[in-house]
């Protein structure tokens, strides 16, 4: 059979050539028969139009009415980020009252990290960074001693950093010490832990026996203690129990403890826990302002907000780990928002995926939802937000000047832990034509600036109105179980640095000419860290 003839007659070059090449007989093309078309059938058209009109008058029910409602994208993300906990009782704790569980059952001896007072700050920092789930190094007098004399954590590292780069302005009695530490750091001399003990206020050391019951730890944590030491009968430290570890325990094992599990279904609004006295910082303030704020107020984290007071991120003392490389020192002069982007980028590299941890809840969130986020983010607190406020689109320049000059002493104002430096945090006024903000809060203070357009802000969270910490949650657990924890404000006051000590609010003030690269020798920490974000 002639291929060209078949192709020409078929009118379909592709199909005919393919079939002819295989030696398959090709039938002649089918002619379109006009009688088969409805184009010449007016009656059919009329019937079709009538049927169409009837369908419009009485449309059939939508199949969507019979479909199960789908999860919203936000609900799906929440489910992925916080999967349901195991609903099967743990044989180890089933049928037991949590107050009958001993502290030693939660001890993990492998998590204890030791250093002696003569160890250098650099070496102690490496112990703190590398695979340390407790985020603390226990310090003893000598390598052979088993008695804990102090601790070294990220708050201490933050205090040391501020002294080294010349941002802390000490009291008169500490001027010589601060100058000596700065001089040794620039000369790349080892600085032992013994010499930096007075740089930050220490939390009270609380030790409990491994044979003590969990209610004693609960009472301590509900009183504001962040961690306790677990000791053996011989007095040796065999573990460190933190607030996070205990909250995580009750979250994972809640099915075994009905009294605790019932609380998880309650709304934060109904439980009335947390505080509405908030300390926050604006997103375009220098990172050093956030570090100084945490140091002077004894905080482990601070909310970063835009001009509409919408939460755009969170900076914690643990994030200081990203500043222990000499190459990262220029970040100190960058904005808080820029540092948040560095934190997110670092998380993405560590976990192999993009991540945006959520550090906020709302008054209608359940306690269980809040605890799930605390456990997932390993954070000490969740910011409570309401519906997002519009964020103005304007250059990132302050609308207001600080209430006092940068070099003037700070006047005390009321904050979460007592007096706060009003030169560093002020409440921006609302525009005259703006609606009244929901739930106006007394003593609520913030820094001032305008969020640049395009940066994440209002659409990510909402207006900051309060905060719920692990101390608040464990205090609730303790009181609901008949315990009597003391007032957490006593521990908060202890962690605060003396308000009489002044600090420089910005690198753009008296020390704007600091050469950070000349300070980088103070660290000498040129290594790549692989450790769990907390």
Curated annotation (Swiss-Prot):
It is found in: Cytoplasm; Nucleus. GO terms for biological process: cellular response to glucose starvation; regulation of mitotic metaphase/anaphase transition. The keyword Ion transport does not apply. Residues 1-45, 388-447, 481-509 are annotated as: Disordered. Its main location: cytoplasm. Gene3D superfamilies: CBS-domain. GO terms for cellular component: cytoplasm; nucleus. Residues 107-172, 199-259, 274-331, 335-391 form the CBS domain. Residues 9-27, 388-403, 499-509 have a biased composition (Low complexity). One of its GO terms (molecular function) is protein serine/threonine phosphatase inhibitor activity. Residues 428-441 have a biased composition (Pro residues). Keywords: CBS domain, Cytoplasm, Nucleus, Repeat. Pfam families: CBS (PF00571). CDD domains: CBS_pair_SF. Belongs to the SDS23 family. Involved in DNA replication and cell separation. This is Protein SDS23. It comes from Chaetomium globosum (strain ATCC 6205 / CBS 148.51 / DSM 1962 / NBRC 6347 / NRRL 1970) (Soil fungus).
């Amino acid at each position: 059979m002639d291929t060209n003839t078949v192709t020409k007659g078929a009118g379909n070059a592709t199909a005919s050539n393919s079939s002819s090449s295989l030696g398959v007989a090709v039938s002649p093309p089918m002619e379109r028969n006009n009688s088969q078309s409805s184009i010449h059938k007016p009656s059919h058209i009329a019937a079709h139009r009538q049927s169409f009109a009837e369908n419009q008058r009485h449309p059939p029910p939508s199949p969507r009415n019979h479909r199960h409602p789908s999860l919203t994208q936000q609900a799906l993300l929440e489910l992925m980020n916080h999967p349901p906990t195991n609903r099967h009782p743990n044989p180890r704790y089933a049928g037991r009252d949590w107050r009958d569980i001993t502290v030693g059952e939660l001890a993990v001896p492998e998590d204890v990290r030791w250093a002696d007072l003569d160890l250098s700050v650099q070496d102690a920092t490496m112990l703190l960074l590398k695979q340390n789930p407790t985020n603390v190094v226990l310090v003893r007098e000598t390598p052979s001693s088993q008695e804990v004399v102090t601790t070294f954590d990220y708050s201490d590292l933050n205090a040391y950093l501020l002294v080294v780069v010349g941002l802390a302005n000490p009291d008169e009695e500490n001027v010589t010490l601060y100058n000596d530490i700065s001089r040794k750091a620039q000369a790349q001399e080892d600085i032992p832990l013994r010499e930096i003990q007075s740089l930050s206020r220490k939390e009270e050391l609380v030790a409990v026996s491994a044979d003590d019951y969990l209610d004693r730890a609960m009472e301590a944590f509900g009183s504001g203690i962040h961690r306790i030491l677990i000791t053996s009968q011989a007095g040796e430290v065999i573990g460190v129990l933190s607030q996070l570890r205990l909250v995580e325990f009750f979250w994972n094992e809640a099915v075994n403890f009905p009294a605790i599990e019932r609380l998880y279904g309650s709304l934060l609004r109904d439980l009335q826990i947390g505080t509405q006295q908030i300390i926050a910082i604006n997103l375009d303030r220098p990172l050093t302002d956030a570090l100084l704020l945490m140091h002077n107020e004894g905080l482990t984290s601070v909310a970063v907000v835009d001009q509409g007071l919408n939460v755009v991120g969170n900076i914690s003392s643990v994030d200081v780990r990203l500043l222990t490389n000499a190459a990262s020192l220029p970040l100190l002069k960058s904005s808080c928002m820029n540092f948040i982007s560095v934190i997110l980028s670092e998380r993405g590299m560590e976990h192999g995926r993009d991540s945006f941890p959520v550090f906020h809840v709302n008054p209608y969130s359940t306690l269980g939802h809040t605890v799930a986020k605390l456990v997932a983010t390993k954070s000490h607190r969740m910011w409570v937000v309401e519906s997002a406020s519009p964020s103005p689109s304007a250059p990132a320049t302050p609308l207001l000047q600080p209430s006092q000059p940068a070099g003037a002493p700070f006047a005390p104002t009321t904050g979460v832990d007592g007096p706060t430096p009003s030169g560093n945090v002020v409440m921006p006024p609302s525009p005259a034509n703006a609606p009244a903000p929901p739930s106006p809060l007394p003593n609520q203070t913030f820094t001032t600036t305008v969020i640049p357009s395009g940066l994440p802000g209002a659409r990510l969270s909402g207006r900051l109105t309060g905060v719920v910490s692990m101390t608040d949650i464990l205090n609730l657990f303790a009181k609901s179980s008949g315990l009597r924890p003391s007032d957490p404000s006593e521990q908060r006051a202890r962690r605060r640095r003396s308000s009489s000590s002044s600090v420089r609010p910005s690198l753009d003030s008296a020390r704007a000419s600091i050469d950070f690269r000349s300070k980088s020798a103070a660290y000498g920490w040129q290594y790549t860290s692989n450790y769990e974000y907390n």
